[in-house]
Design a protein with these regions (language model features):
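Short, Lys/Arg-enriched, disordered terminal segments
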Residues: 1-2, 230
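ABC family nucleotide-binding domain
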Residues: 4-5, 10-221
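H-loop (His-switch) and adjacent beta-strand-loop-beta switch element
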Residues: 218-230
């Protein structure tokens, strides 16, 4: 079994607002994600799902424990290595798409590659962005602004943007949270399609049992503990 993500005894806590107590978000979490797999972490709002994903994505720091991604320890990376990791090793999809309103769909997809760490430039970058939009069925929207397309389409653009630098891991934080059931189903189908065709490892957090059931494996996070469901 080739491991993409390996987490050992990972914990996250922070002081309460009055500073008198310690709030434990999750406690000594262990998780192994196989390369090319799709995994859902499901749980109620406030259970720490997004915090766990942020820690894996190096958007937040753990209190203790270790994380390895592609057999690289994330505990001692330099600031430059952290930036490269966020931009190249992992791709992020959030509940809110955060598309730039004054940029076209095509330009939005290219943004991460233009941030300084992408390997493609010029026509090669444009061609890759166009191909990604074709794969998600939006190559007819290249010159549209985000406000000119539907909410479901905007979230699919966010998926294409997350893949522009060819990451090995896709981290999705409640990606269907702002969508109706029809568009939610379409987005989950798209994520599974990309997981199968591109071999990108998919780790998704969601409060939806229905969405979690579409992944190959599912874990439940509640009361600070992570338990495998299947």
């Amino acid at each position: 079994m080739k491991k993409t993500i390996e987490i050992s005894k990972l914990s996250k806590s922070f002081p309460s607002p009055d500073g008198e107590e310690t709030v434990h978000v999750f406690n000594e979490v262990d998780l192994v994600v196989e390369a090319g797999s799709s995994v859902a972490i499901v749980g109620p709002s406030g259970s720490g799902k997004s915090t766990l994903l942020n820690v894996i994505g190096l958007l937040d720091k753990p209190t203790q424990g270790s994380i390895e991604v592609n057999q690289q320890s994330l505990g001692s990376l330099s600031d430059k290595e952290v930036a490269e990791y966020r931009n190249q090793t992992v791709g992020f999809v959030f509940q809110s798409h955060h598309l730039l309103p004054s940029c076209t769909v095509l330009e939005n997809v290219m943004v991460p590659a233009l941030a300084g760490f992408g390997k493609l430039r010029g026509s090669e970058l444009r061609n890759r962005a166009t191909e990604l939009l074709k794969e998600i069925g939006l190559d007819h929207r290249l010159s549209h602004l985000p406000g000119q397309i539907s909410g479901g389409e905007r979230q699919r653009v966010a998926v294409a943007r997350a893949l522009i630098n060819n990451p090995s891991v896709l981290l999705a934080d409640e990606p269907t949270g702002a969508l109706d059931q029809s568009n939610s189903n379409k987005l989950i189908d798209l994520l599974n399609q990309l997981n199968e065709q591109k071999g990108v490892t998919l780790l998704m957090v969601t409060h939806s049992e229905h969405s979690a059931n579409q992944m190959k494996h599912a874990y439940h996070l509640n009361d600070g503990n992570l338990n495998q469901q299947r």
